[in-house]
Amino acid sequence: MIGNYWSIVKANISPDAPGGQDREDELNEWWNDHQGEYVEKDGFTYGWRTRLTALDHPGAIGTAPHKYHAIYEVDKIATFNRALEEGTISNPGEPWGPWQAYVDDYVLDWERTYYKVLTRHEAKQGKGKFWACVKFDIDLSNPEQEAEFDNWYTNIHMPEICGYAGIYRAWRLEVAPDDGDLGDRRQRFWGVYEVDNPDSFANARLDRTNRGIQPFDGIWLTRVSNFEIAFYQVLSEVDHETAKRRRF
């Protein structure tokens, strides 16, 4: 089973929070377990947690606004909104559980954005430990251009990038506005690539540059804005069936 939407919860941890890194590690340990309590619910298929990394990597572009992402793959947006209302078995009605009393001071810049999964591309077996996330807006003036861009990205560009060593799979995402959103929705499109390490993705882009290929093949580059590339370490991941087995 594959979900049709992602709910991405984005947050930073206050640098002034008591306990420093030890306290942040405790929050991460709790959040990893907490995510599984949602993923075990009907309509959820997968969950990941990621942490921004390699900020000074030469392949990074722009400034990513959040250190942590919690990603939930669901069949429909209403599934996630309903789960928020229900809470979890261990913390009904309190989304942050034992951290509820601290969340306003400890967890900063909290946002929640929903994305429609436009396509998935499975290139290789195996698992990468990092994600390269390409985020951007693009000015497409009519439905024909939208369709042309969609075809290019899905059937040409993404398979080409995934053909490089160390890149296993990828997802294309588009913001899906919903009343359950929190904060700025930011860029309309994301390309998420599961990779061995940040160099895997950066080397793919460098090879294209060395062969004289511009970003977005030069076809769409002048229409692109708010372009960002950020790298994230995958902290944890769990599928629906595994999450259920852990509970029982």
Regions found by a protein language model. Give the residues of each.
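Macromolecular interaction modules
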Residues: 1-248
